[in-house]
């Protein structure tokens, strides 16, 4: 029976010890649960962190695509409008340059103003994608040519 008494005392002791543990366990359990909940949110935020750069990368790619598309669209638009409106203005200016170069025997005073106008117009046409931006240079060149009798 000594065994029985031991087991009874041990049986009696654990329920007594379990009761305080149960009372103590609920108090630390709520405190322990928020930190346990925080690591999953930390894991969730670390999992969300790679997703956000992915979103930003997609946005950057979209913005780059828009920029490239805009540049291509502007270039095509300038090619179409330059082909219709600028083709007639740019071609007569080139023969004038070829025409003025052989006239190097004439006085420089007659040749210089129109040559400078042609030079400005051609530089504008080469530097600008849209020939319409060079209309002022074209007008000055036409006036010079009319004044000099080159038209």
UniProtKB/Swiss-Prot annotation:
PROSITE patterns: CHCH. Disulfide bonds join 114-144, 124-134. A motif (Cx9C motif 1) lies at residues 114-124. InterPro entries: CHCHD2/10-like. Residues 10-26, 39-50, 100-110 have a biased composition (Low complexity). Residues 1-50, 75-110 are annotated as: Disordered. It comes from the Eukaryota. One of its GO terms (molecular function) is sequence-specific DNA binding. Keywords: Disulfide bond, Mitochondrion, Transit peptide. It is found in: Mitochondrion. Residues 27-38 have a biased composition (Pro residues). Residues 1-9 form a transit peptide. Residues 111-151 form the CHCH domain. Coiled coil: none annotated. One of its GO terms (cellular component) is nucleus. GO terms for biological process: mitochondrion organization; positive regulation of transcription by RNA polymerase II. A motif (Cx9C motif 2) lies at residues 134-144. This is Putative coiled-coil-helix-coiled-coil-helix domain-containing protein CHCHD2P9, mitochondrial. It comes from Homo sapiens (Human).
